[in-house]
């Protein structure tokens, strides 16, 4: 949303940026390029074209700093946005309208449209940093980083960017494989808590009770390290079964 401004609103996003960022740093106002949401609607198309031309005339974008919406929208590029999209006006509907409502007293105050950069504009930046905080972003962060690249999840396009970074806290990272199922991607330091988590996961995956798990189950699902540590599936099964039993009683 760095270069987005709500159309027809006195509470433009650029005003928030001015107060919270631009007024706090040493930056020449002539070097700030924000869409003007107060322009007449019939001027928006030409403005968007000129905005893209301005980006090119100054040598392109060095770095884009982005957030991500709970529905995977980047800026206001929602599901279904094509990779060729550029700066334009979009209508605010559904989830994107709820995202915009955070800027206003209520959802009823949110205007109908917004000017936003497009996916192509973002992908042409030399570097992109995507940030997300909190457990409510965990699911969409996992889809963004590890899911299939799809226009249904616009943020997933960043998988194909040559210099993109995702900066998140542990809560937002919770659904990533290296956090939720680290044994699938790396060697682990196996403590009792991690072993229990892995075995419960394996039981759910194979639809078997703990004591029915076999060496093959462990080997085929990334848990061969536990066989090496404990000698057999039987030994791991008994250990975890007893641990859980003692915890319950």
What do the PLM-derived regions correspond to, one by one?
Residues 1-8, 13:
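Single conserved hydrophobic/aromatic residue that forms the stacking wall/gate
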Residues 10, 15-248:
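Conserved phosphate- and dinucleotide-binding cores of soluble alpha/beta proteins
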